A protein has these predicted regions:
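Pocket-lining segment of extracytoplasmic ligand-binding domains
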Residues: 100-101, 180-270
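N-terminal secretory signal peptides
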Residues: 1-13, 20-24
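Conserved C-terminal helix/tail region of periplasmic/extracytoplasmic solute-binding proteins
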Residues: 309-340
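Short, solvent-exposed loop/beta-turn-alpha elements that line the ligand-binding surface or hinge
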Residues: 65-70, 217-222, 289-297
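Bacterial Sec-exported substrate-binding components of ABC uptake systems
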Residues: 21-22, 29-43
Length: 340
């Protein structure tokens, strides 16, 4: 056995015996905060459970959150984007990962939430039939979305506005659940569908449609976060130490996703978050989880605010939304603390 192969084998065998929190420590992402940092104001944390596999850092953070002093971590389950947004605004959930464009819409609607950090880029992909080769080809076409007010339609409206189309006039929107929309795309009964993991992985595996836009590599979408971390405004105001500790755990978990995609994929299957290991592994390998230090989430809020304003979905200016709906204190501190 070569020395290099022996090193690789030893590392795999060693990592195989670690929990994910142990992996974080082994990779230099030690879960313990600085000794001088006070304990969290509460040991209970309620996280809204996001949609799709791309929110894996929130799942991986379970043990890291315990190490941060959270003894009682609850998941507030959501089946739709609306289910996700309501608990954050009401305070039934304290924190949670959510898609960037819908968050901007909620800020415009004066929801009492605050965006705290960017977590990753590149999770959504636009699939089309042969009639759609570029975003501009969506003019006059039929596009399926689960909701006409939030969720994928906010990203799609941003995309068509960016290329000069009017989503209110130029697109025929139809509402269908994700499973139905994928089947309609396969049958050619709709022209396009915006998918989030594991939908893109499934569509590619089944050779349904083709990729028109991949936000992990296609500009300008690859320059901006698709998933952000947000919190209930009152919780963040009254629990700053707990907020920082929770943000730290989730951002460290994003690093684990980037560094150990296979182990995270197995974790997601073993924990019941998804039944398909191959789709989970592809998601972990394809979504760039290592950009939270270098990309500026404020740029993301500004970009989507401008696009959604052009699309007629919001009224507020980017400056107002950034001033009232973002708080980068914790992220800025953690960028210094968690330097690579």
């Amino acid at each position: 056995m070569s020395t290099q192969h022996a090193r690789q084998f030893s590392r795999r065998r060693f990592l195989g015996g670690l929990t994910l929190v142990g992996t974080a420590g082994f990779l230099g992402l030690h879960p313990r905060p600085a000794p001088a940092e006070p304990p969290p104001e509460t040991t209970t944390l309620r996280l809204v459970q996001g949609l799709g596999l791309c929110v894996a850092p929130q799942y991986v953070a379970e043990e890291l959150l315990q190490a941060e002093g959270f003894l009682d971590v609850h998941s507030v389950k959501s089946n739709t984007v609306r289910d996700l947004e309501v608990p954050l605004a009401s305070g039934d959930a304290h924190l949670g990962m959510h898609f960037a464009a819908p968050l901007v819409v909620r800020l415009d609607q004066a929801d009492p939430i605050v965006i705290l950090a960017g977590v990753h880029i590149g999770c959504f992909e636009l699939f089309g039939t042969e009639r759609v080769r570029a975003i501009r080809d969506l003019k006059g076409k039929t596009v399926a979305v689960p909701d006409l007010q939030t969720g994928p339609i906010t990203f799609l409206a941003s995309m068509v506005a960016y290329v000069g189309l009017d989503p209110r006039k130029d697109i025929t929107w139809v509402t269908h659940p994700r499973a139905e929309a994928k089947q309609l795309l396969a049958e050619g009964k709709i022209d396009a569908f915006l998918g989030f993991p594991p939908d893109p992985q499934e569509l590619r595996a089944k050779k349904i449609g083709h990729v028109v836009v991949n936000s992990a590599v296609d500009q300008p979408w690859s320059h901006y976060f698709c998933c952000l971390l947000a919190g209930n405004r009152e919780f963040v105001r009254t629990h700053p130490v707990a907020t920082k500790r929770a943000v730290r755990a989730i951002l460290k978990a994003a690093d684990v996703c980037a560094l150990e995609p296979a182990r995270v994929a197995r974790f997601l299957v073993d924990k019941g978050y998804t039944p398909n290991y191959d789709y989970a592994l592809q998601t972990m390998q394809e979504v760039p989880y290592d950009k939270w230090r270098e990309y500026d989430p404020e740029d993301t809020v500004r970009f989507y605010a401008l696009r959604l304003h052009e699309a007629g979905m919001i009224k507020s200016s980017p400056q107002k939304l950034i001033a009232q709906g973002t708080d980068w204190r914790f992220l800025n501190a953690l960028k210094k603390e968690l330097k690579r």
